[in-house]
Amino acid sequence: MIKVEIGQCLIPELCRKKDITINELSEITGIKKQQLSDYNRLVKVDMSIRTAKRIAAALDCNVEDLYEFKVERH
């Protein structure tokens, strides 16, 4: 069995690297600022693949770069 734990959200760090704000990311992706904030605070962690792809495309990264992940194989 494979267990995946979601760690820290890396969206703010990726925004800093691209020199854009969360507000700008919201405008680029069409995702509400509050929703992006919820992902960052881990209030929401199960974002849809479409949402993850939109954020990743805007930040020029891969979907798996949006969060730290811990994968355990049992």
UniProtKB/Swiss-Prot annotation:
DNA-binding region: 22-41
Gene3D superfamilies: lambda repressor-like DNA-binding domains (1.10.260.40)
Coiled-coil residue spans: none
Keywords, comma-separated and alphabetical: DNA-binding, Transcription, Transcription regulation
InterPro entries recorded: Cro/C1-type_HTH (IPR001387), Lambda_DNA-bd_dom_sf (IPR010982)
One Pfam family named in its UniProt record: HTH_26
Name by which UniProt lists this protein: SPbeta prophage-derived uncharacterized HTH-type transcriptional regulator YopS
Organism the protein comes from: Bacillus subtilis (strain 168)
Chain's gene name: yopS
